Amino acid sequence: MAKLLGLTLVGLVLALYKNHRSSYQTRLNAFREVTPVDLPNCTLVKGIEAGAEDLEILPNGLTFFSTGLKYPGIKSFDPSKPGKILLMDLNEKEPAVSELAIMGNTLDMSSFNPHGISTFIDEDNTVYLLVVSHPDSSSTVEVFKFQEEERSLLHLKTITHELLPSINDIAAVGPESFYATNDHYFADPYLRSWEMYLGLSWSNVVYYSPDKVRVVADGFDFANGIGISLDGKYVYIAELLAHKIHVYEKHANWTLTPLKVLSFDTLVDNISVDPVTGDLWVGCHPNGMRIFFYDSENPPGSEVLRIQSILSEDPKVTVVYAENGTVLQGTTVAAVYKGKLLIGTVFHRALCCDL
């Protein structure tokens, strides 16, 4: 009888393991191969060798890159050096990046580990750059003022909160106010790994302001990129491991109401909103297994989607760029400016293409 119970227990454990393993592989799109889609006149951005996980383009063409991310379970080509914020002017004939000096003595630069970024332009044209950072595996939002003439960032404030344990991306709605995605419920790396493997869908979106902090959406399987429509009425949320983008209606009190969901055959990462058309440009991972289990002989590919008329009954989804990893590995973000497409990656290079 004891042997029978033991065998039954082993069988149940193996069955659960098999089911979870199959689900895990499906969520990571483990068996997908990339069908290449090329763009003309693409050049690698000089000076970016350790990733450009997120980027933000200002209306004047100045572009911020967050680079050097160290993230649990993800490859890093420069693990011993702190991250940086880089700047590039897309109006130049041959744009090149330069590191932005960070002014003030309130930020520990040795542990600076930038992830998602977002800008907010005040009524007096002051540019604020909000940066997700992971010092010592924690999560903070660092608030900077961009000093254009000096080509520097003035550190103003560090934001932490118990409802922000594992921030991935942010969408600024004020100098110190934003929506943030938590890609995990837990902050502890061990618990995070089980949360992800079991597909618990406990990640969420938080609205933060100096006066009020609240969870405004939850139930996500790795909430990732977030963006806001040009008219400010809608919030777009990428659910990485469910291969979905959610559209929420934003209300005057900053709460969100679900409106619609789009599904894809790729892992959707950061979302950029076209400043002219309102289209969504999305950096994607066609095969997530190759991101989380890196093999230089079989590297992760890259994919960029353009989503037009997302609020309509029949949105148009176009694969604008796709590549198997020989040029660009692990695309996380894409954004446009005057006929140019910038593509960033989690740990690799960045690419600039003509559209």
UniProtKB/Swiss-Prot annotation:
Disulphide bridges: 42-353
GO MF terms, alphabetically ordered: acyl-L-homoserine-lactone lactonohydrolase activity; aryldialkylphosphatase activity; arylesterase activity; calcium ion binding; phospholipid binding; protein homodimerization activity
Glycan attachment positions: 253, 270, 324
Modifications made to the protein after synthesis: Glycosylated. The signal sequence is not cleaved.
Primary location: secreted
GO terms under cellular component: extracellular space; high-density lipoprotein particle; spherical high-density lipoprotein particle
Listed EC numbers: 3.1.1.2, 3.1.1.81, 3.1.8.1
Taxonomy of the source species: Eukaryota, Metazoa, Chordata, Craniata, Vertebrata
Active-site residues, as the UniProt record annotates them: 115 (proton acceptor)
Protein name as it appears in the record: Serum paraoxonase/arylesterase 1
Superkingdom field: Eukaryota
Function description: Hydrolyzes the toxic metabolites of a variety of organophosphorus insecticides. Capable of hydrolyzing a broad spectrum of organophosphate substrates and lactones, and a number of aromatic carboxylic acid esters. Mediates an enzymatic protection of low density lipoproteins against oxidative modification.
Cofactor: Ca(2+)
A Pfam entry, by short name: Arylesterase
Gene: Pon1
Location of the protein in the cell: Secreted, Extracellular space
SUPFAM superfamilies on file: Calcium-dependent phosphotriesterase (SSF63829)
UniProt remark on cofactor binding: Binds 2 calcium ions per subunit.
List of residues binding Ca(2+) 1: 53, 168, 224, 269-270
